[in-house]
Swiss-Prot record:
It comes from the Bacteria. This is DNA-directed RNA polymerase subunit alpha. CDD domains: RNAP_alpha_NTD. Residues 1-234 are annotated as: Alpha N-terminal domain (alpha-NTD). It holds the Pfam family RNA_pol_A_bac. It comes from Hahella chejuensis (strain KCTC 2396). DNA-dependent RNA polymerase catalyzes the transcription of DNA into RNA using the four ribonucleoside triphosphates as substrates. The lineage of its organism: Bacteria, Pseudomonadati, Pseudomonadota, Gammaproteobacteria, Oceanospirillales. Its EC number is 2.7.7.6. Residues 248-334 are annotated as: Alpha C-terminal domain (alpha-CTD). One of its GO terms (cellular component) is cytoplasm. The N-terminal domain is essential for RNAP assembly and basal transcription, whereas the C-terminal domain is involved in interaction with transcriptional regulators and with upstream promoter elements.
Amino acid sequence: MQRSLNEFLTPRTIEVNQINATHAKVTLEPLERGFGHTLGSALRRILLSSMPGCAVVEVEIDGVLHEYSTVEGVQEDVIEILLNLKNLAIKMHNRDEATLSLNKKGAGPVLASDIQLDHDVEIANPDMVICNLNSNGDVKMKLKVARGRGYEPADQRNSADDETRAIGRLQLDSSFSPVLRVAYNVESARVEQRTDLDKLVIDLETNGTIDPEEAIRRAATILQQQLAVFVDFDQQNEPEKVEEQEEIDPILLRPVDDLELTVRSANCLKAENIYYIGDLIQRTEVELLKTPNLGKKSLTEIKDVLASRGLSLGMRLENWPPASIRGDDRVLGG
């Protein structure tokens, strides 16, 4: 089959070999020669460094002031406990932060399943051992969980100021990425008479908070979003203009008829294309007195009616007319 020189092959087959719930191999073929390494390297970097996820960022343990302490009745020292908590696989559904509690006493292991969870927080590895207690062991701790991306050292976290943070709040270097391991391999592929094509095989393992197939899909979406700007160089990278919310008092949007003026005064205002109360209050006394057939008696009536509603003549409105009446031909004619 003859192909144009400008026409690139696109993958026809995506095969997912699910080894277990957290481990899968994804095969993509065929690819033009060289594209296996191009896409494989880019996806691998994103999967390892840029995937969003959740992790423990702060820990409070009763009776512990710093990470070099020990806890009576606990076999592990505090540093070991913190290292174990870094391996906690947490998933939050509808928020960016949560504070969880753990209270355990008596001999035996303290597991991730012993953590008291909120309704929208899950732990994917409930059998993970946090520490081990002796017969007189008693441990109480609070865990602050946050959502983030990639790897974040504790000293770069802006949420905790060293001077104001309470003593005993231990900060953790956090790896938010749900991807534990990823590798790729490029093999040969064939389509009809072409034998110089690539087949990309991605071997991926996650912590259980996301399945491997979804992880690759998210990584590909991130890559697509980053490359989209190169598609159209002429597109202006100006920030989108966000229209300020127009805060207009509802009374100003009401017609002048609602003021229940005399017929003479109402007709004079309409003759000057003054249809809304917002139009009226922006006129001055001098301007209204220039209106044909509108005398001082009518002017006094208008001022009194406006005053009863907390309004007056000569007021200035920044966003008038608002969008809701901007298309009104009567307003445009004023």
